A protein has these predicted regions:
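N-terminal membrane topogenic signal
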Residues: 1-19, 61, 281-285
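Membrane-water interface signatures at transmembrane helix termini and the short loops
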Residues: 219-278
């Protein structure tokens, strides 16, 4: 059992196996295998690599641990069509890199370029999925916690956020298609909802359950760990706040896939705070239980896609 725990937590092979299972699950469950769907899958795998880089650079749990990427790819393999059909892989890639850029601005005096880049990526996301604009206050709070947000970086962020809109409107104006802006604005109101998906949508609830099972013990581990430095503590508080923002936003938006995919990306970083600690028997048992739950959800989703449980 200890060897299995160590393999899942520290071995790069575990992350590679999870990535391979994610690809196999995508081939089994996604009916229409288009080029765009393969691109979203590739972006999802790249986001898993970025999690390893973030964990090592900021030492959130253990710099040698590949557990965040493994947990994320395991969650992505449960229902990959959620990413392929709704383009959530692109949102994951854009959001992960924008957060990575902001986290690197810790106590930087001249971070205008980083803020412009990060908020340009978020602006592209908001252009494609307007409900993601709910995360903008959290990003500004992230800059405040990193002690790099001031007047110049704020206006750099504002310019970066509006830049994609100006580019798109300029292209539409030059091609005499500016009239499609009004229907786009009317579609934004249709994305506002006050209800979650029905229980029959396993693709959403399976991912939600997996995210919740990772986040809750991670928060407990963070509360019990009193030896964190100021930067690590600030990052963990921001990550917990981000997951909370995404969970609340799901109640008021129909863009479930984009919001849940971003929450699923952050959850392993929080969960690694508990799972990467050694000498904790409860943690080891919970990780085994989590592995069994993942195996059950994976078999259920693949079996449903193949028609075994219909």
């Amino acid at each position: 059992m200890k060897r299995l725990i160590h393999f899942i937590t520290y071995s790069k092979a575990a992350a590679y196996i999870a990535a391979l299972l994610c690809v196999v699950s995508w081939c089994v469950q996604v009916e229409e295998k288009t080029l765009s769907g393969a691109l979203w899958l590739l972006l999802t795998l790249l986001a898993g690599y970025l999690l390893v880089k973030v964990n090592r650079e900021f030492s959130l749990s253990d710099s040698k641990s590949t557990l965040p990427a493994t947990l994320y790819l395991m969650g992505s393999s449960i229902v990959p069509n959620l990413f392929a059909q709704h383009g959530a892989g692109m949102h994951v890639a854009l959001f992960s890199y924008s957060c990575y850029v902001l986290l690197r601005t810790y106590r930087e005096r001249c971070a205008m370029g980083s803020y412009f880049l990060a908020f340009t990526l978020i602006g592209i996301q908001c252009l494609l999925a307007p409900p993601l604009s709910l995360v903008l206050p959290w990003l500004l709070l992230c800059g405040a916690f990193m002690e790099s947000l001031h007047v110049r970086t704020f206006f750099a962020a504002l310019w970066g956020l509006l830049f994609p809109y100006w580019v798109v409107c300029g292209m539409l104006f030059l091609t005499d298609r500016i009239g499609i802006v009004a229907p786009y604005l009317r579609q934004i109101s249709s994305m506002i909802s006050n209800s979650l998906p029905p229980l029959s949508e396993f693709s959403w609830w399976g991912q939600f359950l997996w995210t919740l099972l990772i986040v809750v013990p991670g928060i407990i581990g963070i509360l019990l760990n009193l030896a964190m430095n100021l930067q690590t503590s600030a990052i963990f508080r921001l990550l917990i706040g981000a997951v909370g923002v995404f969970f609340v936003a799901m109640w008021f938006s129909t863009a479930y896939a984009a919001l849940l995919s971003c929450a699923l990306l952050i959850a392993p970083l929080i969960g690694s705070a508990m799972f990467a600690m050694g000498g904790n028997r409860v943690k080891d048992i919970y990780l085994i239980v989590l592995l069994l739950v993942w195996l059950f959800l994976l078999v259920l989703s693949c079996g449903t896609a193949c028609g075994f449980f219909n």
